[in-house]
Amino acid sequence: MKNKSKYREMSYKELVSKRNDLKQKYMDLRFQAVVGHLDNPLEKRSMRREIAMLNTFIRQKELAGEGAN
């Protein structure tokens, strides 16, 4: 994935804000799917996986002591 190296270089706060943005976009996609107007159904899956990857990097930063709790 092309974003892995980019995510590794991001700070904890940047990762959290990116995750929150993607979660909001994912919710919008879910609502569009319910209404029935979704252009690319695979976009939901890829976004969900990207959120999971961000969660992994956030957790790694927390364990390394870089996260602000």
Curated annotation (Swiss-Prot):
Record's keyword terms, sorted? Ribonucleoprotein, Ribosomal protein
Recorded GO CC terms: ribonucleoprotein complex; ribosome
Q: Does the keyword Ribosomal protein apply?
A: yes
The GO annotation for biological process reads:
translation
Q: Would you say which domain of life the source belongs to?
A: Bacteria
| The keyword Ribosomal protein appears for this protein | yes
Q: Which Gene Ontology MF annotations are present? A: structural constituent of ribosome
| Alphabetized InterPro entries for the sequence | Ribosomal_uL29 (IPR001854), Ribosomal_uL29_sf (IPR036049)
Q: Which HAMAP family match?
A: Ribosomal_uL29
Could you say which protein family the record assigns here? Answer: Belongs to the universal ribosomal protein uL29 family.
- Tell me the protein's name: Large ribosomal subunit protein uL29
Natural source organism: Treponema denticola (strain ATCC 35405 / DSM 14222 / CIP 103919 / JCM 8153 / KCTC 15104)
Q: Which gene does this sequence derive from?
A: rpmC
